[in-house]
């Protein structure tokens, strides 16, 4: 248990000087309380280490979906194109994600830089590079169904969860945002968001009811609620999904 604690602690980020205060309802991951939640025996954190290895800061104000996608693809070891400036090494970046013909034909980088992405566009972009993606709009999820997705998804190493939510429902400033989810504590009913706007907010534990309200907000660009996507690597995408309450 001590070894596990040390390995998890070593992956904890240090928030940059000047990062915004954590909202009153949130618990910063790098606070003593946040670390305690992460290290609890019952906490589902199967995705945490892999995501932390590839934790990204979004390249511009609208690239939250792009940064989240890059984190997910790299953490799942999805085959990537060459990364400019890194010789023959291949990994996903916020630039080369748009050099793949299938993704480039789906959405243009210039448009995302202006407008960001809707839940549907996030789903389509990730699917365009070969992953298996399931999309859940907040309007179609009950609170218990969301809890089930968190319990199951964050206890398994072979999938990733990314949320599209309204910051205001979490007591944060701003509007629509996208970031990966990394852990779930069933005792306090809190989920860890690895916020890709690292210059603005820290990685934070929020309550599941708050996240549920945040993903049920309407995205005016699409006219539908926000929500979350669950991503699997290409090999797993062809396997039948495990039955559940959704």
Predicted regions and their residues:
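A mature extracytoplasmic/lumenal domain signature
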Residues: 68, 137-139, 165-167, 185, ...
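Sec/Tat signal peptide C-region and signal peptidase I cleavage site
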Residues: 15-19
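Cysteine-nucleophile protease catalytic domains, especially the papain-like/related folds used
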Residues: 22-141, 220, 232-245
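Bacterial N-terminal signal peptides
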Residues: 2-12
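Noncatalytic regulatory segments and standalone regulatory/sensor domains
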Residues: 186-246
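A generic secondary-structure signal marking the coil-to-beta-strand transition
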Residues: 60-62, 159, 227
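Active-site-adjacent substructure of cysteine-protease-like catalytic cores
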Residues: 141-192
């Amino acid at each position: 248990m001590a070894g596990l604690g040390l390995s998890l602690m070593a992956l904890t980020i240090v928030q940059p000087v000047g990062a915004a205060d954590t909202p009153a309802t949130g618990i910063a991951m790098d606070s003593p309380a946040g670390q305690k939640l992460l290290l609890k025996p019952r906490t589902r954190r199967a995705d945490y280490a892999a995501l932390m290895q590839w934790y990204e800061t979004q390249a511009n104000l609208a690239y939250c979906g792009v940064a989240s996608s890059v984190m997910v693809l790299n953490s799942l070891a999805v085959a990537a194109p060459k990364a400019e400036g890194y010789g023959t090494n291949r990994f996903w970046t916020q630039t080369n994600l748009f050099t793949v013909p299938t993704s480039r034909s789906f959405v243009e980088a210039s448009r995302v830089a202006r407008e960001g992405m809707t839940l549907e566009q996030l789903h389509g972009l990730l699917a365009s590079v070969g992953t298996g993606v399931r999309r859940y709009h907040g309007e179609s999820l009950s609170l218990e169904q969301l809890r089930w997705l968190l319990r199951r998804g964050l206890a398994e190493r072979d999938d990733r969860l990314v949320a599209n939510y309204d910051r205001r429902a979490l007591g944060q400033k701003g509007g629509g945002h996208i970031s990966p989810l990394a852990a779930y504590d069933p005792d306090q009913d809190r989920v860890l968001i690895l916020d890709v706007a690292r210059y603005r907010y820290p990685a934070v534990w929020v309550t599941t009811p708050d996240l549920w309200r945040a993903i049920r907000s309407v995205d005016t660009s699409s006219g539908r609620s926000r929500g979350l996507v669950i991503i699997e690597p290409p090999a797993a995408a062809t396997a039948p999904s495990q039955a559940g309450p959704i």
